[in-house]
Structure formats: structure tokens, C-alpha cells
């Protein structure tokens, strides 16, 4: 039952991002709710789905799918500092990919944005890959796999 709840939460969280951001639904919702209303609805739904996802993961049974080699834990520990640097760099001012940003007023990309346009997505991609490599259970595959699918730049 707990694995089913985790799977449904992962589908709603990941699918909700794709559905609400789709070019055919988003404009309709923005027209009906306004930009701020849409962002409020989107944020509230994703926050609820994410909380459910984490709650379900914490309660999921451990079902081993494979036994990760010890080196995978070292790989995860090696990738996490890079993921953290990318995440912190993405929170810098003048982020062309942040909600409400006006890219035309940002000028030449600087800092981490001179390296990649989406440092936060790369941070989550590395984070998910590192955790998938270091964990071999069904709940981890569902959680980290769904976040990887969402984060792939």
C-alpha cells in the first residue's frame, strides 16, 4: 500500500509539472486565474504533492532491487558537492530562468549562467543520479527516478 501511495504521489508531482506547464493548459489557466493566481495554484499543488511524495517515501517498505557496490556511495559523496555548488549558484541574482525573470534585461550571462542556463536542473539531475546509484531499493528508484525525469535539462 505504501509503495502504491509513493508511486501515485510521484506520478502526480512529476505529471503535474508537465501538465500544468503544457502549452495548451497553462495559457488557459493563466487567462482564467491570472498569472499570480496560476502561480499560486501551481505552487500549492506541487507543494502538496511533494509533501505527499516525501511522506510516502519515509513510510515505504524496503524492497531490494539490487545491492549497490560500495563505490556507488563514494560516487554519491563525490557528486553531491558539485550538485550543491550548482544549486547555490542557481539562487544568485539575475537568474534568467527564475519565475518572472525578464531575460532581455539580464545582459550577458555571467557566473554559473555562463556555464549552463539551468544550474538548478543540473544540480537536481546530479543529486538524483547520485542517489539512484547509491540506493538499490524500489522506493528510492520511484522517488529519485521521478525527480530525475523532472530535472533532466
Region locations from a protein language model:
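Membrane-anchoring alpha-helices and their flanking helix-loop junctions
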Residues: 1-117, 122-153
Amino acid at each position: 500500500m505504501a509503495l502504491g501511495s509513493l508511486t501515485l504521489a510521484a506520478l502526480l508531482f512529476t505529471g503535474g509539472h508537465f501538465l500544468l506547464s503544457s502549452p495548451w493548459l497553462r495559457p488557459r489557466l493563466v487567462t482564467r486565474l491570472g498569472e499570480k493566481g496560476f502561480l499560486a495554484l501551481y505552487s500549492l499543488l506541487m507543494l502538496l504533492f511533494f509533501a505527499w511524495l516525501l511522506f510516502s517515501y519515509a513510510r515505504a517498505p524496503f524492497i531490494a532491487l539490487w545491492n549497490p557496490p560500495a563505490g556507488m556511495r563514494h560516487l554519491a559523496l563525490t557528486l553531491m558537492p558539485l550538485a550543491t555548488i550548482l544549486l547555490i549558484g542557481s539562487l544568485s541574482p539575475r537568474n534568467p530562468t527564475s519565475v518572472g525573470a525578464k531575460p532581455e534585461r539580464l545582459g550577458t550571462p555571467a557566473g554559473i549562467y555562463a556555464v549552463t542556463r539551468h544550474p538548478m536542473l543540473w544540480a537536481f539531475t546530479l543529486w538524483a543520479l547520485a542517489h539512484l546509484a547509491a540506493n538499490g531499493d524500489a522506493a528510492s528508484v520511484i522517488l529519485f527516478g521521478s525527480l530525475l525525469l523532472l530535472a533532466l535539462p
